[in-house]
Amino acid sequence: MRARADSLIEDFDIEAHRVVFSAKGQSHAASDYFMKSAANISFFLEEEAVDEDGRLLKDKGRAINKIGHALHDLDPVFADISHNADFEALSRGIGMADPLLLQSMVICKQPYIGGEVNTHQDSTFIYTEPETCTGFWLALEDATIENGCMWAAPGGHKAGLRQRFVRNGDGMKMITLEAVS
């Protein structure tokens, strides 16, 4: 998967799309490119990888923040892995009656650049009623405390949803939900 992600980045025409992904302001969410990314293989850049005029400050391979959001359907390598019977069995084993793949991403943790991703719940961004969104995270390289591994709050999935990322006209906005006791 890592080799395939590197190949996709190498083949990506960075001149065609220079959308910066930022977990801080979510300004990327207003772009048509982001809004259509659910049905595509789309590339998003790190904030520090481009200057104010959109020129690259880093090598293309070190400028990518993430690739998303339909790798599982549109790329044969990711599709073979994502649609593997083991994932379906795992999903059913944790109680999913009808597991569906809705989104896939490669999140690149670039050295020395990259914004902090605040604590969040995946259902903030992929909401279902009832709340049944479950994310599977696969490390494509060693993840340690020193290099910024993902953290999880034990039992956090039982605490109730705190925020939702919802459509707002042509873009998106974050709303805070009622406090959960």
What spans do the regions from the language model cover?
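Non-heme Fe(II)-dependent double-stranded beta-helix
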Residues: 1-117
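Short, conserved beta-strand element in jelly-roll/cupin
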Residues: 91, 95, 120, 126-145
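Catalytic-core "active-site belt" of small-molecule-metabolizing enzymes
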Residues: 100, 119, 125, 132, ...
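Short, structured patches in soluble enzyme cores that scaffold and shape functional sites
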Residues: 103-105, 110, 121-123, 138-142, ...
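Short, function-defining helix-loop hinge/capping sites that tune catalysis or transport
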Residues: 111, 128-130, 162
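Double-stranded beta-helix
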Residues: 143-181
